[in-house]
Amino acid sequence: MTQSASTAPSWSIDPADVARFSAIAAEWWDPRGKFAPLHVFNPCRLSFIREQALARFERDGNGRTPFEGLRLLDIGCGGGLLSEPMARLGFTVTAVDASEKNIKTAATHAAEQGLEIGYRPATAEQLLAEGAGPFDVVLTMEVVEHVADPGEFLRTCAKLLAPGGLMIVATLNRTLKALALAKIGAEYVLRWVPPGTHDWKQFLKPDELRAFLAGEPVDVHGPFGVAYNPLTGRWSRSADCDINYMMTVTKD
């Protein structure tokens, strides 16, 4: 018998964060709403994921659906801002989130777009306990800084990755610069995101992320910095990893 999301193994989940995002779940697809910063960030994230996946799986990027036949897991999918474009690129997408409200919002929007995405309220630990996967690609984008046990969470994600697969992690660096700009500036000065969205103490340094996965049969690459240009209003790749960065994880 399959466990429900409420009784499944979920020791990495932070209930307070789940409740915080559930409260604003209806706004996921509003480009001017509380998730507006993610809408602006999304093109940069999508470009990085596509580039890394094309290289890892040696696919031709000229077609509309270069990733047909590959299974992708989007962990902490929220309203589906990444799940939908991944499905359009040909991936068979499974997308999970600890918030049932997020999943309902995501599933409704996908149905309106005519997209088939396997949405369900669940945790990474639940999927592993059920024997789900393995998946060719695992995404955990802007999620690890919101969980209670980042090490356990990342190791669980790595276990869901298939041999030959690719995992991409995006998060925030625990630096004074990130505290000033991503926490105080973004939440309390510019009001880009609701106050309390982030806890600076939960931001991860790249070396910490790497250490969490040291016992897994994976290789960790990066960090790859990304930065926001207030003059253009766009995100782009950067050598600066002091605030936002991404890392890739491969399993051979």
Curated annotation (Swiss-Prot):
<comment type="pathway">
    <text>Cofactor biosynthesis; ubiquinone biosynthesis.</text>
</comment>
<keyword id="KW-0831">Ubiquinone biosynthesis</keyword>
<dbReference type="Pfam" id="PF13489">
    <property type="entry name" value="Methyltransf_23"/>
</dbReference>
<feature type="binding site">
    <location>
        <position position="97"/>
    </location>
    <ligand>
        <name>S-adenosyl-L-methionine</name>
    </ligand>
</feature>
<comment type="similarity">
    <text>Belongs to the methyltransferase superfamily. UbiG/COQ3 family.</text>
</comment>
<dbReference type="InterPro" id="IPR029063">
    <property type="entry name" value="SAM-dependent_MTases_sf"/>
</dbReference>
<feature type="binding site">
    <location>
        <position position="45"/>
    </location>
    <ligand>
        <name>S-adenosyl-L-methionine</name>
    </ligand>
</feature>
<feature type="binding site">
    <location>
        <position position="76"/>
    </location>
    <ligand>
        <name>S-adenosyl-L-methionine</name>
    </ligand>
</feature>
<dbReference type="GO" id="GO:0102208">
    <property type="term" value="F:2-polyprenyl-6-hydroxyphenol methylase activity"/>
</dbReference>
<feature type="binding site">
    <location>
        <position position="141"/>
    </location>
    <ligand>
        <name>S-adenosyl-L-methionine</name>
    </ligand>
</feature>
<keyword id="KW-0808">Transferase</keyword>
<dbReference type="GO" id="GO:0061542">
    <property type="term" value="F:3-demethylubiquinol 3-O-methyltransferase activity"/>
</dbReference>
<dbReference type="GO" id="GO:0032259">
    <property type="term" value="P:methylation"/>
</dbReference>
<dbReference type="InterPro" id="IPR010233">
    <property type="entry name" value="UbiG_MeTrfase"/>
</dbReference>
<keyword id="KW-0949">S-adenosyl-L-methionine</keyword>
<comment type="function">
    <text>O-methyltransferase that catalyzes the 2 O-methylation steps in the ubiquinone biosynthetic pathway.</text>
</comment>
<keyword id="KW-0489">Methyltransferase</keyword>
<protein>
    <recommendedName>
        <fullName>Ubiquinone biosynthesis O-methyltransferase</fullName>
        <ecNumber>2.1.1.222</ecNumber>
        <ecNumber>2.1.1.64</ecNumber>
    </recommendedName>
</protein>
<dbReference type="GO" id="GO:0010420">
    <property type="term" value="F:polyprenyldihydroxybenzoate methyltransferase activity"/>
</dbReference>
